[in-house]
Amino acid sequence: MTDIREYLARKPLLFDGGMGTYYKAAPGADCEMANLTDPEGVKKVHAEYLAAGAQAIKTNTFGLPRMAAAQMPGWEELAEAGWKLACDAAAEKDAAVFADLGPAPDTEAAPASSAYGLVAQQFAALGAKNFLFETLSSDVGIVEAVKALRVAVPDAFVMVSFAVLPDGYTREGLLFRDLLRRMEQSGVVDAVGLNCVSAPGAMKKLVQSLGETLLPLSVMPNAGYPVVTRARVLYQGKPAYFAREMGQIAAAGVRILGGCCGTTPAHIAALRAELDALPQQTEAAPAAKLSTGAAPAVEKDDTFLRKLNAGEKVIAIELDSPRVADLSGYLDGARRLQAAGADLLTIADCPIAQARMDSSLVACRVHRELGMCALPHMTCRDRNLNATKALLLGLYAEGVREVLAITGDPIPTAERDEVKNVYQFNSRKLAQYIVSLAGEGREMPSAMTVFGALNLNARNFDVELRRAVEKLENGMSGFLTQPVLSAQAVENLRKARQTLGERAKILAGMMPVVSQRNAIFMENEINGIHVEEDIIQRFAGLDREQGEALGLEVSMQMAREALPYADGFYLMTPFNRVALMERLIARLKTELLDAEG
């Protein structure tokens, strides 16, 4: 085939379909391994797609970046075999061959850019000129790998395609518009696109909502949505429907088309006929723009944020939601804390992985019935992306516009057979996702404010600070810290202020210790809390009244030391002792905050 860029200037380019699902429709080995164990079978699949009218095919190497990241032996041989099989099949039809690279995991030990780079360079050494990075949930490592690739192959044609759910977000919570825009702005990519996860009808809506793109756009949806029949995953989307929807996508100006999971040669043949029936055009037409349909903003109480942004010291207080279905006592406690002077009520999301009333639902009740600013904690532990989004939309509609994004305590090992962790993303990605929901044409007219956790007691606080910087870069506005109960925690707070600067609002955590037993438990059994031995020993032999009195003194001492580096305080209520926290709030206001003001 002539140069891909020249071809696209004249007419749309039709790719093949889902190699993996089509090959596995017949008994056989794993798809990539078949390059060595069943080369004729792989070549036959290529030939069927070409006979159906495809002008470009992908090498049978989707899983190689994952294999390279895991340092699996033999992936280089799979790349070479896959490349030769595709080239041999394409030669008979003068079709283009794209080196196909699926997603790579990203870890500190094995960055995604390294895996992408290894596989891309392997294909470059084999003579590849066209590259497809596909089914990606994020763009991590892509630009770095492509820049390195262009050193070896300056005239390479590089496509980058993202796997997007019907709502426009990847499984990592990234909005497709943002991903495509970043790829366009990188200056190293030739075409951008969407593939997999969604069916053609949903993908058509995404394309119509996108507007004009600077680079050629690729669309390769699944044949439909999967069903499980007799323990097999099948796609039942009909070729005629697939072709009709894709024909409308092509008419909107999309220049690169094809199929992903479940698309067979029959789907590609039907699409070939649909494309041949379209009027010829020499330039890509912009995709249509639809009205945003954005809902009007709902009124909310922003007293807390207004004070915080004005430089006033604020008081946030945490009150754990009940373990039972009765919220009346909880609301009474919240009302007392509000009257005492708390600016914000925070509600933990099932702390130490033990079920309590949902923090977001409690926040809505507090906001609605008390008119108090509420900050629900939201963990990554218990919800996937869909459940998280549904909850966020509900919070926004209820006027709760602040959230604390945390990874969350893991489920205890003994319970994991019955209760499963989710952890689809970490707190940084969750924050990025929450921020991405807001804006013109998106789900929320205005952005929610996202806070994060900062562990002042981390053993390696330099690593914790680096993560804090990443959290800010991903959209967080500030931090609530773990309890300050040591001189080292105060020093780490000072370092945090110095490193993060004034752009980060920091609320210093204060949790009154109420007994020696309580102090020992906190030191030994609660992750992220460190109580100095001197403090533990001071509680020896004290009764409840004496313990609370000393706990207040220790908290006030720590608050005085933390105040120069904090924008306020984050108070944690031990054992739901509201009366104790009323006393602490009163002392903080009269002895520190009012005096400072």
Predicted features, each with a name:
Residues 1-597:
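Domain-level signal for soluble alpha/beta catalytic cores
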